[in-house]
Amino acid sequence: MRIAPSLLSTAIVAALLSAPVVADELTGTLKKIKETGTITLGHRDASIPFSYLGTEPGKPIGYSHDLQLKVVEAVKKELNLPELKVRYNLVTSQTRIPLVQNGTVDIECGSTTNNEERQKQVDFSVGIFEVGTRLLSKKTANIKDFDDLKGKNVVTTAGTTSERLLKAMNADKKMGMNIISAKDHGESFMMLESGRAVAFMMDDALLYGEMAKAKKPDDWVVGGTPQSFEIYGCMVRKGDAAFKKVVDKAITDTYASGEVNKIYDKWFTQPIPPKGLNLNFPMSEELKKLIASPTDKAAEQM
C-alpha cells in the first residue's frame, strides 16, 4: 500500500514531536546528565535541618535535600531516564560555588543565600527558604543583642553572608570583637559549646538546628535583632536556562501541590535525626509568601 506524500510527511513530523529528547538536542547540564546517565548533587555535612549527613554513610538528608530529590525526579521525566543514577558530592561554604561552576556538581541545595554578589557567578532556583540572621548563645551568658558582643569572641562560619555582615558590623561600629571563622556550622557550634566564643552568628533556622543537636539543648537560646533577611536557593551553573527551568518547575510544582508543607513539617516541627529532637520552628509568614509567589530574586532585590 502506498501512502500519500502529504500523509507521510505529517506522520514523520508527528513521530519527531513525540520522540524522546535525545542528547544532540540538549545543551549544558541536561546534555551532560543525558550522556552520562548520572546527576551529581551537591550537599552539606552539617547544615541541620537543610542538608546534612544522616546515619547512612555519605548520604545526605534534610529539607533542602528533599526538594533536591524532587528535581531528580523531574530530570528523570524530562530526559526519559528512569534509571538515572544519583551521585553525592560534599561541599562546604568555601567550595560550593566553584564546584557548581566547574561542573563537578550539577545542582547544590543546602543553606545557600541567593544574593547579588553570588548571582554574578551562578544562577539560583526560585527561593526555597527565608531566614533572619541572629545569634545563638548560652542562656547564662546573658547575650540579648548584638551590642552585647563588644570586645568578645564571636564565631561564625567562613564563606557565609553572616561572616561578611559580622566583619562589617565590627568595623563600622568599632565593636572590638574577635571574630572566629570556623570551617562549617558544626565547628562553629563546637567553638561556642567549648567556651571559645560567647555567641554564634548565623541564619536563625540553622542556629535552631545546632541547638537541637547540643548535649543540653535547653541551655541555649536564639536571640538578637535580625541583621538581614535572606532567601535560600538551589545553585546551578550560570546561563543554563534549560536546566534552571526544569529545576524551578520541580520546586514550584511541589509548592502548588501543597507537598512542601509535609516536607517542612517533617524537618521543622517533628523529631529529626540524629537525636530525635524537635526544632519547633513553625513556618514563617515570609516563607508562606515565598511559597505562594515563588521568585528567584535575592531578598535585597525584592
Swiss-Prot record:
Name by which UniProt lists this protein: L-glutamate/L-aspartate-binding protein
Keywords assigned: Amino-acid transport, Periplasm, Signal, Transport
Function: Binds L-glutamate and L-aspartate.
Residues annotated as signal peptide: 1-23
Chief localization: periplasm
Subcellular location: Periplasm
UniProt xrefs under Pfam families: SBP_bac_3
Organism the protein comes from: Pseudomonas aeruginosa (strain ATCC 15692 / DSM 22644 / CIP 104116 / JCM 14847 / LMG 12228 / 1C / PRS 101 / PAO1)
Lineage: Bacteria, Pseudomonadati, Pseudomonadota, Gammaproteobacteria, Pseudomonadales
Family: Belongs to the bacterial solute-binding protein 3 family.
GO cellular component, one term: extracellular space
GO biological process terms, semicolon-separated: amino acid transport; D-amino acid transport
